[in-house]
Structure formats: C-alpha cells, structure tokens
Amino acid sequence: MNDKDLSTWQTFCRLWPIVSPFRIGLIVAAVALILNAAGDTLMLSLLKPLLDEGFGKASSDVLKWMPLIVIALMIMRGLSGFVSSYCISWVSGKVVMQMRRRLFSHMMGMPVSFFDQQSTGTLLSRITYDSEQVASSSSSALITVVREGASIIGLFVLMFYYSWQLSLILIVIAPIVSLVIRVVSKRFRSISKNMQNSMGQVTASAEQMLKGHKEVLIFGGQNVETERFNKVSNHMRQQGMKMVSASSISDPIIQLIASFALAFVLYAASFPDIMETLTAGKITVVFSSMIALMRPLKSLTNVNAQFQRGMAACQTLFSILDMEQEKDDGKLELKKANGDIEFRNVTFCYPTKELPALQNISMYIPAGKIVALVGRSGSGKSTIANLLTRFYDVNEGNIFLDGHDLREYKLSSLRGQVALVSQNVHLFNDTVANNIAYASENRYSREEIEKAAEMAYAMDFIRKLDNGLDTMIGENGVLLSGGQRQRIAIARALLRDSPVLILDEATSALDTESERAIQAALDELQKNRTSLVIAHRLSTIENADEILVVEDGHIVERGDHLSLLERNGVYSQLHRMQFGQ
C-alpha cells in the first residue's frame, strides 16, 4: 500500500469531486445548520430585554410577546435540525455508495498479484468499514463545524454588539486554541491509520476462522484462533483508547485557556470606564455568551478527531485507487482463435518470491492438440496456465496465440478464448443454472445450459435438487459436494465452448466412478480445440498428444505416454509411484 502522507487539505480536495455532485444537499444542510445556530444565539439575546425591561419595568410588554418568540425560535430550531440531519444523511449515503462502487470497480481490475498480497479480510474492511468512515466521520464533522462555527460567530457578534471591550479579550485565546488543535490533529491522523489497519486485522482473523471452521474443529484450534482474535481485538481497543486520550487531554487544555479568559473578563468588567457602559442585561448576555462558547469550542476540538478519522480512511482508500490496474494495452480482438499456442524462452518469478517459478520454458501446442503437464507439486505447472490467461505477465520471453504475443490482444478478448476448470472451483451464491452460464445468463437458452450439464454428468444430481437448475447453492456452492461443484465448473466450460481449454486438476475432486463417467465428456470436449491439461492422476492424460514433465521450473522431459515410460526417467518414476509398479 502507498503510505504517502497527504495533508488533510490535499486529501479533502481529492474527495471533493465525489462529494460535489451532491452539493445542493450540502448547501441546504448548511443553511439549516446556520438557522439552527442562529436560534440558539437569538434565544440568548432575549436575556437583555428580559432583564432590563421585562423585570425592570412593571408596565413592560416584553413578558407578553416573549413566549411567542420563544415558541417560534424552538419551531425554527426543530425544523432546521430535521432538514440538516436528513440532507447530511442523504449526502453521506450517496458518498458511501460512490466510494464503494469506485473501490469495488477498481479492485476488479487489479492484477492477481494484488490479491495474492492482501488478505480478503483486509480488503473487505476497506470496502465496508473504511468507506463508511469516510462519509460518517466527515459528515459528522461537517455538521459540527458548520453548526458550532455559526454559533461561535453568532455569539461573538452578540458579545461585540453589547461590549466590544470585553469581547476583545477572547480574541487573544483564538491563536492558542488553534495551536492546540493543530498539534492534536497530527496525533489523530496517526492513530486513525492504525485503527484502520487494526480493523483489517480483526476482519481477516474472523474471516479466517469462519472459512476454516472445519479445520479449526478437527485440529482443536479453538484456543489458537481465540488467542489470535483476542490479540488483534485488544490492539484495536488500545488504538481507540489512544484516540480517546488525545481527545480528552485537548479538551481540558482548551477549557483551561478559556477559563482564564473568562476570569479576566470578569475582572475587566469591574473597571469604572467599562462598568458605565454595562447594564444588568448586557453583562448577563456577554458573560452567558462567553460560557456558551465553551460548548462549540469543545465540539470543534472533538470534531477534529472525527474529521481526521475520515481523512485517514479516505487516504487509505485513495492509496488503493492509485494502484495500477492490470495492463491492458492490446489492440487486437479475436472472435474465435484457431488455438496455436507457443511459449518461447519464458521466465517468470512471482512478485513475492526470489527464485523464478519458470525458467527458459519453450513449447509449442498446435491448434486442436492436447498437451499435458505433469510433475510434483510446486514444479510450475499451474504457473504456465496462469501465464496463458495473463493472470501474470512474463518477466522474460514471449507467449504467442495464433502468432501474436498475448500482450497484443485486449484482455477481455484473450480471456474470452479460454475456458478454465481448476482444482479450486469457485461457485457463486446463485442458482445452478446461473452458475453454469455465469456472466452470460442471457446469452444461452435453457436447453443449452441443460445440455452442458448433461455432458458434464451433472444433471443426475441436479434433478434431485429441490428446484433443479433453479436451486440456490449457497456461498461457494456450500450445499454441494466437492465432486458436484467440480461438475458444475466443467459444465460451465462446456457451455462456453472456447477454442482453448485449460484443465487444472479438473477431476481431482471426483471419485473413481465419476471420473470415468466424466472423462468421456472431457474427451469429447477436447476435440477440435487446443487443450492444456494439468494432471496429477497420470491415468487421465495417457492419450495426450504430448506430455511435458515439469520440475523446478524446467521442462525436463517431453513425449507421448509410451515413449516417456520407455525412457525410464522422471515420468516413468511418477507412473510407478502412482500405480505401485
């Protein structure tokens, strides 16, 4: 993540284009807040006529019209309070939605390496918690700044109107208060960043337990996970207490500064020259206004913590939005590729690794042929598939499809030529039919979806489901067995009918009987298309046109099944290990 420290103003300037489309709501809210603050000031100003005329003169009419004014002011405060709260909430909701949409859209365009380096819990926290913090903290801060700022201005005007000499004393404390706020602001920003990171750790810890709850139960890891969660939760609590401490310390400092000013005002009011200009009503209004200033001053100090929290969250989100998305500089588009694939001197190293996963790999797969990759775990087989789909880009060398470097094609066009069935099947919380026709629900007919399911030998169990193809399968197909989930994925690939097929341990989750049944469908699927088959079970690739043996990122053997057995090398050794020969 980019932790470049942006000033509050710079961060706010970046946020403003997102907020500005809803500025009418902000303007209405600001006007309502000013009216709300004006109501408080006007209520306070009624003290002078009440004391000097209402109680001072027996025949005064002040006491007769004063109740009507009070009722009118209270109605104004109530209505303005409602309007301001509604408008701010409306703007806040819109900003949260826009931030989440922008973040979600940007993340979808990020390279696979980005997700490899970030925990799912942390990213979820960014989309949910941080986005909410930007709007809620900033909107709360805006309400306080406008309302309390208007209150301070109104109270100063009131004080200067009745006694400018006494009011000048308060001007002295303004620079001191601003200095305190500035010092505390830096502390708030630092703590807010730590709180966001802590929230990401809390989310990641909870997500890890929820996703791996079976492993936690079977291995007795409850204490380990509880301790881990308690640790990150306590760290977040500590950051929260630091925020409270910084805020709590700044409050009494400002109040102490203000109290000295008030004490000096009382002392100055006893000077004969000043006393001659004051009445009981005037001194009461001036002194009451000074006491009333304490509340907005305290609120403005506290709002700084809220605003800094929002700006820190905003900065974190912008650091993600500033990250470069997948490079998609290609211009070529394919309707349907022939399927000629060539790897030429390809070397690749994962961003977080020191040693390359593939070194100087070269191979050619003619259109319509089946090439199998075999080797021990971690040898680099799946990396080859990842490079062919441009989930990663090569560090050295080139990969060609129909004679053109993969980087010359638009990403969407390139990936549209490839159907992928991996050992890690991901299904969506949707119906069986929509999972088979994922992202193309309106492109295929019901009959085509059902035919693909039949070819994948999936209709046998689909018919037994409560609603057949319209059955909801839960998050990641939790209501299906591993083999059933894999058959749905194979049906998805069959329906897509792409010219290039990648089978990455496609039958690994199937039992022997299901594997035999589906192998016929896979054999039919592989006809007239280029197939790259990554296999652990060697029995599934005996009929491949060519078998490549990958070891430590190198192709160490190549040939068909029989020739590799006769060579008595790595492939022959793997074969003997599997079949007990």
Curated annotation (Swiss-Prot):
GO cellular component: plasma membrane
The species this protein was found in: Photorhabdus laumondii subsp. laumondii (strain DSM 15139 / CIP 105565 / TT01)
Quaternary structure and interacting proteins, as annotated: Homodimer.
Domain ABC transporter: 341-577
Gene: msbA
Major localization listed first in the record, in broad terms: membrane
Function as written in the Swiss-Prot or TrEMBL entry: Involved in lipopolysaccharide (LPS) biosynthesis. Translocates lipid A-core from the inner to the outer leaflet of the inner membrane. Transmembrane domains (TMD) form a pore in the inner membrane and the ATP-binding domain (NBD) is responsible for energy generation.
Membrane topology of this protein: Multi-pass membrane protein
Protein name: ATP-dependent lipid A-core flippase
Domain notes: In MsbA the ATP-binding domain (NBD) and the transmembrane domain (TMD) are fused.
